[in-house]
């Protein structure tokens, strides 16, 4: 499927459905879906690299609050593009600061975006992406509180099949897990009377404050601040519940 065909076909797809890898494959250089990434930390860089390896995209734009995140990710993403014969990301398509996401979304060359920021920003950034007419893959969770989730529901209701948008609950769409759930529901292992779940982790490290402001310190270490992360139960619950 060529890029233009994919973009036109979005009208036939319901809001917040998963985009299957085969949907994005193309056979010509100009058929690649042009993607931008909002939030260039380790998670975002890893996810968009994986998308590139499994689908026909070219990464053309980056946005982040911090320059060091941009520069570190740039090395990886230029390599990802190079491996597929695509050009490096232009300096003019690198956006830094609190309005960086809006600048990227205003880039007419961008077809779709990956939103991989701290969770508190997901509703706002997703809303802006949809308003800009961009297809979006937004990392989980949808939001950190009930009001944020209601906001996301409203965003989804307003898409009306015009865009492809999905949250990163990839386990829900993975064939092995779908088959497992189907077999359980069909009684393949009998009646389930008890389920026990265990999760062991060393936790997320917290960085030094150095000379940064408290706001910057809090955002860089957002997992340690419930007000902008939702807390451990939310962050881990979205991973271990299927």
Q: Which residues fall in each region the model found?
A:
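N-terminal glycine-/serine-/threonine-rich beta1-alpha1-beta2 phosphate-ribose binding loop
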Residues: 1-134, 151-164
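ADP-ribose/adenylate-binding Rossmann-like module
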Residues: 133-145
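Soluble or luminal CAZymes and related metallo-dependent hydrolases
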Residues: 69, 96, 148, 172, ...
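Glycine-rich phosphate-binding loop at the start of an alpha helix
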Residues: 123, 146, 174
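Predominantly a Rossmann-like dinucleotide-binding segment in NAD(P)-dependent oxidoreductases
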Residues: 39, 158-166, 171-242
């Amino acid at each position: 499927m060529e890029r233009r065909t994919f973009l036109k076909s979005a009208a036939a797809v319901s809001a917040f459905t998963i985009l299957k890898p085969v949907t994005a494959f193309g056979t010509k250089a100009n058929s690649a879906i042009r993607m931008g990434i909002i939030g260039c930390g380790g998670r975002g860089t890893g996810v968009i690299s994986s998308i590139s390896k499994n689908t026909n995209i070219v990464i053309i734009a980056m946005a982040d609050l911090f320059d060091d995140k941009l520069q570190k990710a740039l090395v990886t993403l230029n390599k990802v593009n190079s491996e597929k014969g695509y050009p490096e990301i232009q300096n003019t398509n690198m956006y830094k600061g609190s309005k960086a996401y809006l600048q990227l979304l205003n880039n007419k060359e961008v077809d779709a975006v990956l939103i991989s920021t701290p969770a508190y920003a997901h509703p706002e950034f997703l809303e802006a992406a949809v308003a800009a007419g961009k297809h979006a893959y937004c990392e989980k969770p949808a939001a950190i509180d009930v009001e944020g989730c209601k906001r996301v529901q409203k965003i989804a209701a307003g898409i009306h099949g015009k865009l492809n948008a999905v949250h990163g609950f990839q386990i829900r769409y993975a064939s092995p897990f779908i088959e497992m759930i189907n077999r359980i529901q069909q009684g393949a292992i009998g009646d389930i009377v008890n389920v026990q779940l265990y999760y062991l982790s060393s936790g997320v490290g917290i960085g030094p404050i150095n000379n940064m402001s408290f706001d910057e310190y809090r955002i860089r270490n957002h997992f340690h601040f419930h007000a902008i992360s939702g807390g451990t139960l939310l962050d881990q619950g979205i991973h271990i519940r299927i």
